[in-house]
C-alpha cells in the first residue's frame, strides 16, 4: 500500500487523513524501507504538508505511543527544535518555573539533535532524574508537579524512521508532529516552531485533534520560543478559535535583551545558566526570556488572564526563590515504585 501512497505524492497530490494515518502506521510498524521513508519525507517537505496529513500522522503517533494518565489541566512546553540559535534550554527552565506555581507540567523532550543541548542532556547535568517508566512519570507529576517524558521511551516505534531522518539531514514532518504527540495527551501547550509559516496549519490540526489552548511561537530572530531580543509571532488556538498576533518583550513589561546573553556552547553551560536563572543571579536577558516563556505557558494553562500577567507571576517566582526551591525538590532523590 505504501508504494501506491508514494506514487500519489509523486504526482503532486496530497494524502487524505486516513491515507496519512496508514502511511505513518506502515513506517512505525517497521514495514517501510529506509528509501521509502526518505522518499515520503522529501516529497512532503518539497510540497508542504497539509492539515489532513498532519492530523493523520499525529493520530497514528498517538495511537502507537505509550501514554500516561494525567489530568486535563497538565501543560507542556516543547519546541520543534532546529532553530540553530544555540540558546540554553529556555522551555525546560520555563517548565520548572511554572511547576513551582502549582501548574502540572508533562515536559516532552529528547537529547540534542540539532541544538547544543537537549532537555534530557541539561536535566542530567542538573542532577534531575529522567523518569524511566510511565508509572514513575505519573508519580513525579503528582508529587513534584513536573515529569520529564523522554520521547524514545514513549514513541518506541519512531526508531524505524531514525536512520532515514539522520541521513537526509533536513527538517521533516517529524519535527513538526513530535510536540503534538505528548504522551500525557496535553490539551494546553506552548509549542516553539522554527518557522511561523507552519503555525496556522499546526493550530488547525490541533483544533481537530481536540486541543483547548495552544500557543505556537516563533521569534523573529529565529528562535523556536518567545524571544527577548525581538518580536515573536504567535498563533493562538483557544476554545476552537485561531488568531495570529505579535508580542514584543515590552508588551509584557520586559526590556529588550541580548541574544548573546542566552547562548551556550554545551549542556554544561546550559545547566549552569539555567541554575543561575533559578537563583536569580543570571544576566537579566536570561531571567527575562525564561519569565516571558513561562508567562506564555501560565496564560495557556489558564493560570493567568494575559501573557503579561503570567510574566509578572513568573518573574516573582524567580525573584522570590520559589522557582529555585522547586529546582531543589526536583533534584531530591526518592524511591519511585514502578507498577
Curated annotation (Swiss-Prot):
Q: Which organism is it from?
A: Geobacillus kaustophilus (strain HTA426)
Pathway connected to this protein: Amino-acid biosynthesis; L-tryptophan biosynthesis; L-tryptophan from chorismate: step 2/5
Q: Which cofactor does it need?
A: Mg(2+)
Annotated residues that bind Mg(2+) 1 are located at 91, 225
Family named by the database record? Belongs to the anthranilate phosphoribosyltransferase family.
Where along this sequence does the record place binding of anthranilate 2?
A: 165
Domain of life, source organism: Bacteria
What are the binding positions for anthranilate 1 in this chain?
79, 110
Name recorded for this polypeptide: Anthranilate phosphoribosyltransferase
Gene3D superfamilies in UniProt = Nucleoside phosphorylase/phosphoribosyltransferase catalytic domain, Transferase, Pyrimidine Nucleoside Phosphorylase, Chain C
**What InterPro entries does the entry give?**
Anthranilate_Pribosyl_Tfrase, Glycosyl_Trfase_fam3, Glycosyl_Trfase_fam3_N_dom, Glycosyl_Trfase_fam3_N_dom_sf, Nuc_phospho_transferase
